[in-house]
């Protein structure tokens, strides 16, 4: 059968080159996963300053330890721990504010009985009473005096095997570690004037900011690691740590380094980012009460603003990633409001904004390092969207909000209709905000996030202000421009080509001959026969099929097949056991409110139909994985695809993979499946309709859910090419034999072709309806 092409794609789509797979993920426009691209992932050139790039959240980067520094006297910076590492007993450090506080620290070796030792403190020789009863631990002792000519008194001790102590000035106090390792902790003993207090140190030391207090605790209690990551290889003077700060202007070009051919330019720019979300709202066929999709789309926006008196022409592209799919089903009747899928961005989503302007900073953005940005947050609030139904009150989706916070910036390339622009991609993480969104006149309410229905809330644009800085390697001669390196992003001409191709495909449905379609659907279409009729690709079928298989691997059908067992068991078990209900037909509105008693669970037929719909979606997988000679919906969709590929004038090697993948997911969305038990047929549809009827008379009988659950597990599942309504209509108007009825129930292609060749209007209308559903 023609659906062999889908089976062949599935069975051969699991061998792929990893680099191609990475490129595929990076180029994907809409996906339900988060892609964390590296800072140089979008260009073909290496960074000037080699580094690890971005790291996963679970990866720990050990902070660099600032030091070691040579013994010296200096004004210890406020909010910095001074971690001292002496190697021998004696005076370690001392300090004073020169008015009313003098403090000193001495180190005593193990096993020292109480004794008096001489130390030179504050320029004077003094005797201090010291002792250390431990035979293994060294002991730091803190002495303090309150007058210039006063005597030192012992205030605190720290017993340690690591010979490390630390103190810090903050909030007008001196903080010090006390206790015994590995349980030593910080405390304070002095109130001083932090600005005028100097420290004299007799040993090597390190500096740690207050934000790394936990790391300082670790060093004090456990010692320095064997090979710690330090700023200096050997101890250096503390003066080498002094940095000359220059006040940077918001917008300036600085020559960092220069040779005869190249120079490094630092560009500092303030920036105003304006962006908009785009969306797509697609209605399903029928009476106009059902929507197929509400989704986000990339949106380009051009604008101008003034920077330091200069008018800047800017271009942004806004896209989203990691969207969340929601749905709403108001019932199974054609007049019941429902949305098959609508996208919402939440905490697990990302927003990408690619920015370019015509300033000097973007003219040579190829070799870039030290790229950074500081941006304000932005709140995006959803507006009202009214679903204009043909009859009845109109539901309104309203509310929803998210806050965008800057997460990072990388290089990217924006593609327009005329040229490629090297640009900056700003990544934003999301947090949900008030209010939540809801759909009026439905039970859907209290959901947080920003839905795709009206994400711009009727405002012209959202705006984010900030600044960025980068160092770019450019030619010394400003008259030359570094060539732009092409790269892959989500905005390519491919999307435009696919849009035109979809329109052509949908228009070709009127040109398909029904009899030839049935013949084609019965043929075993393989990879070569499927694509051999395409003139532009006949010589590249082998290489093209590799791309098709890689694309098909990520389709919904491929993912669903891999989870077939779980999907079937979960869906089947969700339907109530030991219960019989009446079928739901097109005119059975009076039965919708009928209650079904299932143990202690009281539900409506409408609820049961929703569960039946879930089972029906899994029945495609059940049929797909079993070989049969009967015609299936996938056979018809593959035959329609083959016919349209042969007739298309716009098909190309780059668009075929997307078309093949989309066709497997979107062709014939309203499918009906049946299982046969002796003289009774059970038929369920994706739309939630379900029937049970006699195969000889087509009279309806109660739908035995328990029996149905057993049949879909043990019996063949058949595509209802000719569904129950069509069969009953055919029998009432023309009359058919029991043999013909069984063959139509089993979707026998020979019998179908006979009815078509005899111009039976009921059968022809049904097949034409299926072809019309083969839309992209």
UniProtKB/Swiss-Prot annotation:
Stretches the record annotates as Spike body and stalk (antigen domain): 248-479
Residue ranges of region Spike foot?
A: 510-776
Q: Which HAMAP family match?
A: Rota_A_VP4, Rota_VP4
Mind telling me what this protein is named? Answer: Outer capsid protein VP4
Task: Give the disulfide map.
Answer: 318-380
- What else is on record for this protein? This strain probably does not use sialic acid to attach to the host cell. In group A rotaviruses, VP4 defines the P serotype.
Query: Which residues does the UniProt site feature Cleavage point to?
Result: 231-232, 241-242, 247-248
Keyword tags? Capsid protein, Coiled coil, Disulfide bond, Hemagglutinin, Host cell membrane, Host cytoplasm, Host cytoskeleton, Host endoplasmic reticulum, Host membrane, Host-virus interaction, Membrane, Outer capsid protein, Viral attachment to host cell, Viral penetration into host cytoplasm, Viral penetration via permeabilization of host membrane, Virion, Virus entry into host cell
Q: Which InterPro entries match?
A: ConA-like_dom_sf, Rota_A_VP4, Rota_VP4_MID, Rota_VP4_MID_sf, VP4_concanavalin-like, VP4_helical
Any one cellular component term from GO for this entry? host cytoskeleton
Task: Give the UniProt record's GO annotations in the biological process aspect.
Answer: permeabilization of host organelle membrane involved in viral entry into host cell; virion attachment to host cell
